[in-house]
Every structure is written in structure tokens, then in C-alpha cells.
A protein has these predicted regions:
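Juxta-kinase regulatory segment immediately upstream of eukaryotic protein kinase catalytic domains
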Residues: 1-36
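Conserved ATP-binding subdomain of kinase catalytic cores across diverse folds
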Residues: 28-168
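Conserved protein kinase catalytic core
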Residues: 62-63, 177, 225, 242-244
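ATP-dependent phospho-/nucleotidyl transfer catalytic cores
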Residues: 126-213, 243-249, 253-256, 260, ...
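Short, glycine/acidic-enriched loop or turn micro-motifs at the edges of active sites
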Residues: 174, 222, 239
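Catalytic-loop of the protein kinase fold
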Residues: 212-222
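Activation-loop N-terminal segment of eukaryotic-like protein kinases
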Residues: 227-230
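C-lobe/activation-segment region of protein kinase-like
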Residues: 233-344
Length: 353
């Protein structure tokens, strides 16, 4: 059953927001406390009936606002599928896809199927948008990074010229998993062990649930996952892709090849994150330790559960980390190592018993 307090808040906040005119809602959003801006849009904190609400404003291009494209989950700009990896400042795949995923995930909570996602109370198209984020400001650099794609250029130009945004009014969960895991590992071995158990369990449960329903998050790093100390909440769906979207044939094939992506990505991120937080290693030493543990070496002294996680998932993390280094630093079209990761997942299950 869904949490009754969450449902009560949802009912009150969603009704209150729905009763505002576009003009009044725009005024409230403009007066909200700014939290930041980035490649996915601007964010702010709004209070509605004493309840904090996270507002994300996603740029909405003129192409997306055309009547024939309203609410479309198609890849309207023909963005190459390798931009799903989100490295190097990707152009994104459109606001309507993000809205569709929020609608899907909110219904999971309301239907009592799954609690580990933030609720969307309301959405609205509002006038006004922001300048291109820093990651996209150097258009020539971004286009060159993505192989000179004319579709990437067209998308960035459209973002630059947009005059409206999709405002998403979301449940506010203030702490990221990255922040929380840092706190827990610094609090001592007992706290670190409890945190490792919770995170490993919740990552598995969340990715399995989403993937079984045809949704790949594709950007579940630990600043896009929120935590309240009891469970994790998978947030920020700017790169999410669903088998229920209006996919091009190339996207359908890409989706099928990447069905293991979320599980591998989150486990690899956990390994890399623990090495950084427990041992203080930078990239070079971190990657060396992953390779050593993957080859069978014991991790250095540290919290027992953290060491167990490293030993268990290092072989998978070694494959995934190597793939990401190649995508980020060498070739955006590096083939996804699906077979090697499948074998690593099978071995993972064996090690867990």
C-alpha cells in the first residue's frame, strides 16, 4: 500500500497547483527560491500549503510545441542514440519524454506498485526559459564532441531559441544518495555497513522494477538518486527511455541491447563511489583498485560490507568503467559490451549465492 502521508500531500498539493492560472502559477515559480541550473533545466523550491515542492523547468523548443508534436515521445530531432550515455554535455531527447516518465512513475506510487520515485504533483507549460547551460554554451565544441552531428546542432539551436519551458512540480526529497553515502561512510564502520546494505538492496530493487516495466533510467548516478534514510528514490528522467515510447527502429535496437544497462551502471557507480569515499582515491588509483579486485585481490582494510561490495561487483565494474572511459575519452560510438556485462551479472549472482 502507498504511504498515506504521501497520498494526502499529493492530493492537497496537486489540487492547489491545478487551481492556479498560468499567469499566477508563473508568478509563484518566478518568486520561488532558486536551487540551481544545469543541462536539464533550472530548479527552484516552492512552498504550497506549507509543503515544499521542487520545481524543475525544462526548456521546451518550438518543434516540441507544434500541435502535431504535443506530448510526443518520438525522438523529434533525430538525436543519435549514443547521446543516451550523457557524457560530455548531451543535448537531451526532449521535454515530453521526461514528462511521460514522470507520469508513469507517479502512477506507480499512486497505484501502490512502487514507492522509490518522487511524485509529480502537477505540470504546466509556462513562458520564459533560461540561457543555454554552461555544458552546451560552446556549441561548436559540443557538436564536435558528438561526432559533428547536424541533429545535435539543430537541437542545441532550438534550445537556444526556445521561449517556453515545461514546469514539473515534484515531491521534494532534499538529500542525494551521494551526499548521504558520504555522511554514512564518515560516521564509522557500523554506519557504513548499514548504508552499503541498504543501497545495494535498493539499487537492485529499483532497477529491477523499472526495467521489468520497460523503462531504462540511463542516468542513475548518485546525484540523481535521492534518499530519506529508509529507501532510495530514482529521480531526474532527462535521459530515460521506455519501450512504450514512439521509438525509431534504431532506438528499439538500442533499447534491446541495453536492457542490462541500469543494473550494471548502478553497481559500477556504487563500486567507484565507495572506493572514493572509503579510501579517498582519485580516478587513476580507483580504476587500478577496481582492476585488482576484479582479478581476485582483496580490497584494502575498511568497513566489512563495503569490502564485500567491492569484491562482489568489481569484475562488472571493471568492464563498465573501461567502457565509459572509452566512450568519454575516445569514441562516442564504442559498442556497449553487452555480452561481457551479461557474464559479469551472472557471476555476480553466483557470488551472492
Amino acid at each position: 500500500m502507498p504511504d498515506s502521508a504521501r497520498l494526502t500531500a499529493y492530493s492537497a498539493v496537486s489540487t492547489s497547483l491545478a487551481l492556479h492560472s498560468d499567469r499566477r502559477l508563473g508568478e509563484l515559480v518566478d518568486a520561488a527560491l532558486p536551487l540551481g541550473s544545469g543541462i536539464g533545466g533550472r530548479s527552484a523550491l516552492l512552498e504550497v500549503g506549507g509543503k515544499p515542492v521542487f520545481v524543475k523547468r525544462v526548456p521546451l523548443t518550438e518543434v516540441e510545441r507544434l500541435p502535431e508534436h504535443a506530448r510526443s515521445t518520438a525522438n523529434l530531432f533525430g538525436i543519435p542514440t549514443f547521446c543516451q550515455y550523457g557524457v560530455g554535455g548531451g543535448p537531451g531527447f526532449g521535454a515530453w519524454r521526461e514528462l511521460a516518465v514522470h507520469t508513469m512513475t507517479t502512477n506507480w506510487v499512486l497505484g501502490g506498485e512502487y514507492e522509490g520515485v518522487p511524485l509529480m504533483y502537477h505540470w504546466r507549460v509556462l513562458p520564459g526559459t533560461a540561457a543555454l547551460p554552461e555544458e552546451l554554451a560552446d556549441v561548436e565544441r559540443v557538436v564536435a564532441y558528438w561526432g559533428g552531428s547536424p541533429d545535435v546542432r539543430r537541437r542545441i539551436d532550438a534550445l537556444q531559441q526556445s521561449t517556453a519551458s515545461l514546469a514539473l512540480f515534484l515531491e521534494y526529497i532534499p538529500r542525494t544518495l551521494d551526499e548521504w553515502l558520504t555522511e554514512q561512510t564518515e560516521a564509522g564502520e557500523e554506519g557504513a555497513d548499514r548504508a552499503c546494505s541498504l543501497v545495494e538492496r535498493e539499487l537492485e530493487a529499483g532497477t529491477s522494477f523499472m526495467n521489468a516495466r520497460g523503462l531504462l533510467h540511463f542516468d542513475a548516478h548518485f546525484q540523481n538518486i535521492l534518499v530519506d534514510g529508509r529507501r532510495l528514490y530514482f529521480a531526474d528522467y532527462g535521459l530515460a527511455i521506455s519501450s512504450r515510447f514512439d521509438l525509431a527502429p534504431s532506438e528499439t535496437g538500442f533499447f534491446e541491447r541495453h536492457r542490462t544497462y541500469d543494473r550494471c551502471y548502478t553497481r559500477s557507480w556504487l563500486v567507484n563511489s565507495l572506493i572514493t569515499k572509503v579510501y579517498g582515491y582519485g580516478r587513476e588509483k580507483r580504476e587500478a583498485l577496481i582492476r585488482a579486485c576484479a582479478a581476485g585481490e582483496e580490497p584494502p582494510d575498511g568497513p566489512q560490507k563495503a569490502r564485500a561490495v567491492l569484491s562482489r561487483h568489481a569484475p562488472l565494474a571493471a568492464v563498465m568503467t573501461d567502457f565509459y572511459v572509452k566512450v568519454q575519452d575516445e569514441d562516442r560510438e564504442t559498442p556497449y559490451p553487452a555480452e561481457a556485462l551479461h557474464r559479469a551479472l551472472q557471476a555476480d549472482r553466483t557470488r551472492r549465492g
